A protein has these predicted regions:
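Alpha-helical transmembrane cores and adjacent cytosolic helix/loop segments
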Residues: 1-219
């Protein structure tokens, strides 16, 4: 059928299905990314990569809430956040706080002992792939959000953009360590991830008690 002959309702439903598919892909990708990053982070003794992997699993919880949000908005465009989404935000927020504490303490211990990872090449590869994939997801979610005129989906795109920033932190820290061998780069990268984790955690907790659209809606 010619797309120009589709009714506005049919086009809208297709766009919502695409938005839901994008949210599911984000969840699945984060699971695989988390497993890979945590495994090699542990094996290569790189805190930044391991912390990045833990963050990916926390993003899965957030992603479940976002997927649920897309379905809710599809059925009731003007509805407010429901208990499931608020619970997902709270779990996400407190998990980020725990991660922040762990990253800061680990980074301090690493800097004190001048710990040297065996290698950070996997961190370079994982972060590069993540930047490409997450950037593509940001563009796709923004396009769908604009077509649907949905602030919720546009907010989700902003959440995904934060993942690009965190991948950039991992890339810089991992790349500089491989180039220089300076032991503090891994610790500094870990602290950079801790900053974003704390920011996301704080916003998730605050937004769980409000009707703001997303737990990480940075401009």
């Amino acid at each position: 059928m010619n797309p120009t002959l589709l009714s506005p309702t049919t086009v809208t439903q297709r766009l919502y299905r695409l938005a839901f598919a994008l949210s599911l892909f984000t969840i699945v990708y984060n699971v695989f990314e988390g497993l890979l990053a945590m495994y090699f982070g542990w094996a290569d003794e790189t805190l930044a990569l391991f912390g990045f992997g833990v963050d990916s699993f926390i993003e899965v919880v957030s992603g479940l809430g976002i997927a649920h949000m897309v379905l809710r908005v599809q059925r009731h465009p003007t509805s407010s956040r429901d208990p499931f989404e608020r619970t997902a935000l709270r779990v996400t927020g407190y998990s980020f706080y725990v991660l922040t504490a762990g990253l800061v303490l680990s980074a301090a211990a690493s800097a004190w002992t001048q710990h040297r990872p065996a290698t950070t090449w996997v961190g370079v590869i994982v972060s590069l792939v993540s930047i490409v994939v997450m950037s593509a997801l940001v563009v796709a979610k923004q396009r769908v959000g604009r077509q649907l005129e949905s602030p919720s989906i546009l907010a989700d795109a902003n959440c995904t953009r934060v993942c690009v920033y965190m991948s950039g932190v991992l890339l810089v820290a991992s790349g500089l360590y491989e180039l220089t061998g300076w032991p503090y780069f891994d610790a500094l990268g870990t602290l950079g991830l801790a900053y974003f984790a704390f920011s996301e955690g704080r916003e998730a907790i605050e937004n769980a008690a409000s009707d703001k659209l997303c737990g990480c809606c940075h401009p």
